[in-house]
Amino acid sequence: MRLNTLSPAAGSKSAPKRVGRGIGSGLGKTAGRGHKGQKSRSGGGVRVGFEGGQMPLKIRLPKFGFTSRRALVTAEVRLLELAKVNGDVVDLNALKDANVITRNIQFAKIVLSGTIDRPVTVKGLKVTKGARAAIEAAGGKIEE
């Protein structure tokens, strides 16, 4: 068997529809578009969300909420992800170096998800109550 001799099994691939190629094809003349109207024209069709001129649902409904700018640069870190960090000190830069969080993250919070089996020192990160208990139970400590 060679790469240049590979081919799909017989009958597994159907040929694409060839539209506008005569009456006998079943898709001749209007090519399956019907007669006249906007959708039969080249480039015909309406934009996403257009409702024929009536007030669209998106505009009929009220605006609500907002996107916190801080949330865009904040990350949650699970306990089991702390195992990827080399060394005993876990801080923002250590998490970035271990590719646990991306470079644009400015704040991180450690949450209780999974387990931690080695003592680590957490510096300058927020920690949930459950994660704090798990880190201290493993012999680690948290420094604000």
From Swiss-Prot:
GO cellular component terms listed in the entry, alphabetical order: cytosolic large ribosomal subunit
Lineage top rank: taxon: Bacteria
MF terms in GO: rRNA binding; structural constituent of ribosome
Compositionally biased tracts (Gly residues): 21-31
InterPro entries: Ribosomal_uL15, Ribosomal_uL15/eL18, Ribosomal_uL15/eL18_sf, Ribosomal_uL15_bac-type, Ribosomal_uL15_CS
Key words of the record: Ribonucleoprotein, Ribosomal protein, RNA-binding, rRNA-binding
NCBIfam families: rplO_bact
Protein task: Binds to the 23S rRNA.
Record family assignment: Belongs to the universal ribosomal protein uL15 family.
Name used for this protein in its record: Large ribosomal subunit protein uL15
Gene for this chain: rplO
